[in-house]
Amino acid sequence: LPVQRSFTRTCTPMAFNLPNLLTWQRILAIPLLVCVYLVPFDAWGEHSRNLVATILFILASITDWLDGWLARRLGQQTELGAFLDPVADKLLVCVALVMLLDLGRINAGIAIIIIGREITISALREWMASIGARKSVAVNWMGKVKTAVQMLAIPMLLYHDPIGSFDCQYWGSWMITLAAIQTFISMAYYLKQAWPQLRGDTGAH
């Protein structure tokens, strides 16, 4: 019993505080986003699916900002939250891009650039952390701008339909192209920052 109480005190605040619960909700929203388009439901037309998918993505994106803000405000920053938050973000974006590719709303090149970058830089950050050099590839303003543009472009492409005279597909396509360019530039920057460690590791082998 003492061991069980100790385990509960340690794990409950870490795994189930409010910021982490918001992050878990963002992860749970991902299969819901997929189901909107893949589960047959005759009562839903394309517009309804687009609207629901857009709302889900926007709500999930809001939790991305909210969980970090709450963690800092409430003093509930945890290692689990620091790990889950970027994982949830990348999963959400990558799944949305795959769905948009399947719907024919973006081209494969854009999806490959953005998804490839997320996988590459995530792996790079983990490796840099393992050798004590994570600060060299910490998120900077370029990464934040890239993320902001992605989070604006994807809802437009999910909604797809025009809003009055505003063509969501047209402007969403331009913005996701801009995001892909920013993605490539930020990847090159992070690889350059990590190059001394990468070169040293290669030399050691």
What does each of the following model-derived ranges do?
Residues Q4-H205:
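Alpha-helical transmembrane bundles and membrane-interface segments of multipass inner-membrane proteins
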